[in-house]
């Protein structure tokens, strides 16, 4: 269901619809493709229990009131009940329609034609205050339709939160801003604590998995530039497993990330969001995820969050504190 002009309308996955702002988008980001209609039965360790607690409903109410999107909802994150029940959410900036169409992602795609909610930076800051967050994760859709990729809007949101309370820690999981350094600088020049850019998969699978405008080394060079310009800012990336990669390729990706100074890495199981998206090639066991974590720490990462249900922003506050995670 999509809420358009305040009315809930059923939009089929893979279908085109018109947004409240007058531009077209594709529901769940991928048009209907029968060849991907393969579903693999999930193992027991991936089953999640729904828990609509009072805190969950509070977070939902706050984000709706302030007209904010969350990646928790738009990307169908399996941890939404756990995180929202603990009063945390990952705010997704610049709307819920992405200009890119990665084959794993269920965020809607389209061309917003320059639309932005000018009130969003302050609305986001006020929501953070109402939720009582000490650590907030910001992410966004890609906005290739904007001259700076939305970097200025993103930076304004970070600044609004820090102006509200400079003690709030902010993690920015950003787009690659087309690899343009002056756009990246807009994020670096805020008081952001963590800058993340997800590599998503191993180098061999980058083209079939990610949008053609994204790139394996474009992501790594982004993170390298951040670390060179601001050594005190923690850098972070994330890998999905289960797309057809080998363990050796995962370890090579870890090496590549460490070579550009990445501090934190997360690894989680890819789960096919709709029948039109890439199929799951394998389900990795919790034991193997623990092995990934062990290897990652040996390679020098300050922290490795690795588990079937881990996503890039999952328990981000705990990862920031560099605790050993019981995942």
Curated annotation (Swiss-Prot):
SUPFAM superfamilies: Radical SAM enzymes (SSF102114)
Annotated [4Fe-4S] cluster 2 binding sites: 98, 102, 105
Main localization (coarse): cytoplasm
Presence of keyword Mitochondrion: no
This protein's GO CC annotations: cytoplasm
Cofactor remark from the record: Binds 2 [4Fe-4S] clusters per subunit. One cluster is coordinated with 3 cysteines and an exchangeable S-adenosyl-L-methionine.
Entry protein name: Lipoyl synthase
Organism: Francisella tularensis subsp. tularensis (strain SCHU S4 / Schu 4)
């Amino acid at each position: 269901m999509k809420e358009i002009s305040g009315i809930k309308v059923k939009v089929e996955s893979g279908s085109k619809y018109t947004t409240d702002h007058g531009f077209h988008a594709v529901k769940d980001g991928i048009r209907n493709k029968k060849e991907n209609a393969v579903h693999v039965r999930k193992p027991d360790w991936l089953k999640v229990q729904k828990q609509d607690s009072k805190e969950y409903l509070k977070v939902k109410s706050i984000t709706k009131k302030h007209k904010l999107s969350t990646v928790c909802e738009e990307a169908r994150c399996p941890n939404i009940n756990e995180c929202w029940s603990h009063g945390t959410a990952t705010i997704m900036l610049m709307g819920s329609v992405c200009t890119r169409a990665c084959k794993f992602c269920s965020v809607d795609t389209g061309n917003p034609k320059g639309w932005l909610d000018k009130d969003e930076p302050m609305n986001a800051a006020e929501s953070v205050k109402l939720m009582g967050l000490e650590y907030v994760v910001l992410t966004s859709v890609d906005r290739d339709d904007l001259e700076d990729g939305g970097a200025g809007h993103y930076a304004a949101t970070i600044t609004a939160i820090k102006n509200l309370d400079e003690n709030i820690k902010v993690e920015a999981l950003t787009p690659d801003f087309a690899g343009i350094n002056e756009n990246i600088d807009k994020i670096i020049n805020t008081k952001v604590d963590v800058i993340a850019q997800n590599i998503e998969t191993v180098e061999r699978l980058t083209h079939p998995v990610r949008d053609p405008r994204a790139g394996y080394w474009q992501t790594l060079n982004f993170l390298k530039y951040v670390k060179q310009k601001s050594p005190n800012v923690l850098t972070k990336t994330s890998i999905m497993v289960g797309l057809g990669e080998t363990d050796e390729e995962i370890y090579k990706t870890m090496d590549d990330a460490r070579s550009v100074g990445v501090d934190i890495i997360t690894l989680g199981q890819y789960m096919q969001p709709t029948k039109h998206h890439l199929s799951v090639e394998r389900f990795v066991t919790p034991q193997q995820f623990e092995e990934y974590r062990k290897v990652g720490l040996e390679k020098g990462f300050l922290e490795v969050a690795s588990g079937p249900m881990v996503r890039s922003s999952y328990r981000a506050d705990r990862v920031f504190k560099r605790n050993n995670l019981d995942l």
